[in-house]
Structure formats: structure tokens, C-alpha cells
């Protein structure tokens, strides 16, 4: 394991961006993506550190850590659902299939917690009792575990700090069929359960 001194000494070498001649980058918060003509995509995880979509600095080795973590989770969940990863030729790089993303963000929540406007606790504390189209009783406490995990959807708001909560009816109105939503719901819960099982082995608690 690297010492704090070794990490500090690597700050000047932190990986901010890359340029591949002949290809146009799609720059995200942390990853730079390049679409290839053959239907594949190059994803490069940088060391950019962001908070609510604002870059605040660079953290040495962050890119390779999150890229390798993603690769590990893809392997651990391949029996639940296919994924886009083809190869990891470098600690910071994933070669993947291009795919059309869902027009929504999906989050499985096991606890009533959070500090953002779209979090369960923020809305509950403000007096809301129907959140994401689901009814919640009075008397819940912050960070309390829910009787069972719930699947929630939110509108993707690119360039904005927070997402907007959606009900199932909102999801269907955005062109997602009831059949597809049922599959999304099922796969999301199974992924969350697998995540919980593996997190416990590392003395971690998967909250959402």
C-alpha cells in the first residue's frame, strides 16, 4: 500500500486529460470517452476529482482505482446482467461496446439518508411523505434502514448538480415500456443484493 508521502509526491504527476489524435473526446466529470467507428468505445478514467459536477482538484491514482474497481464489479455481476466491458488494456482504460444509455438514473436505496435535494431524507425531513411515488410513514429517523430496499428513478440533468426525482408514471412517460422498467427494477435489486453480499465480506455497508 502506498504511504501518504508517496501519494503527495505523485500530485504533480496526477492525470488530468489525454488527447488521442484523430478522435474526438467526450469529456465527462472523471472519464474521457472516445467513440470508434467499429462500435467500440475507449473510456479513460482520469484523476479529476469532482463534487456535484464541479472539478475541485486532482487525486493521484484515482483514475486507475475507479477503473479497476469497475472492472472487478463487472466480473462479480456478469451472471446477473451483461455489461459493456470488453478489455482493460491499462489500469486507466476500458475498451467497451457502445450502447444507448437509459434516459433516467436508477438508484436502489436501502436506508433513508442523504443530503442532496433528491435524497430520501432531505425530502422526508421537509415534510414529504410520498417520495418517488412511494408512501413513507411518519416517525422515521435519519439513516434508518428501510424494511426492504427500494428502486428509485431520477431525471438525468447533465451539467447540473442534482437530479430530479421521478415516479414510475414519469418513467413510462419518457418512453420506457412497462416491460423494460420491470426488468430494470429486477436487475437493479439483484445487483444491490450482490453488492451487499460482497460489501459485508470487506466490512462495508452498502447504503445505496
Model-assigned labels for residue ranges:
Residues 1-7, 173-174, 179:
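Short, compositionally biased leader-like segments
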Residues 2-157:
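Active-site loop/lid in soluble adenylation, ligation, and acyl-transfer enzymes
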Residues 31-32, 205-208:
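Short acidic loop-to-beta-strand element that houses the catalytic metal-binding Asp/Glu
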Residues 146-177:
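A short mid-domain helix/strand-loop element embedded in enzyme catalytic domains
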Residues 174-205:
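A long amphipathic alpha-helix within ATP-dependent nucleotide-binding catalytic cores
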Amino acid at each position: 500500500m502506498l504511504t501518504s508521502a508517496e501519494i503527495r509526491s505523485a500530485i504533480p504527476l496526477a492525470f488530468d486529460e489525454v488527447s488521442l489524435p484523430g478522435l474526438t473526446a467526450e469529456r465527462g466529470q472523471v472519464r474521457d470517452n472516445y467513440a470508434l467507428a467499429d462500435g467500440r468505445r475507449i473510456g479513460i478514467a482520469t484523476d479529476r476529482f469532482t463534487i456535484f459536477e464541479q472539478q475541485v482538484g486532482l487525486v493521484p491514482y484515482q483514475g486507475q482505482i475507479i477503473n479497476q474497481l469497475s472492472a472487478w464489479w463487472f466480473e462479480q455481476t456478469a451472471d446477473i446482467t451483461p455489461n459493456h466491458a470488453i478489455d482493460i488494456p491499462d489500469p486507466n482504460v476500458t475498451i467497451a461496446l457502445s450502447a444507448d444509455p437509459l434516459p433516467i438514473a436508477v438508484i436502489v436505496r436501502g436506508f433513508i439518508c442523504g443530503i442532496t435535494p433528491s435524497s430520501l431524507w432531505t425530502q422526508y425531513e421537509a415534510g414529504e411523505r410520498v417520495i418517488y411515488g412511494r408512501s413513507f410513514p411518519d416517525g422515521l429517523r435519519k439513516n434508518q434502514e428501510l424494511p426492504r430496499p427500494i428502486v428509485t428513478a431520477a431525471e438525468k440533468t447533465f451539467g447540473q448538480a442534482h437530479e430530479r426525482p421521478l415516479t414510475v408514471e414519469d418513467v413510462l412517460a419518457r418512453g420506457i415500456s412497462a416491460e423494460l422498467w420491470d426488468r430494470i427494477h429486477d436487475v437493479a435489486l439483484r445487483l444491490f443484493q450482490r453488492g451487499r453480499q460482497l460489501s459485508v465480506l470487506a466490512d462495508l455497508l452498502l447504503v445505496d
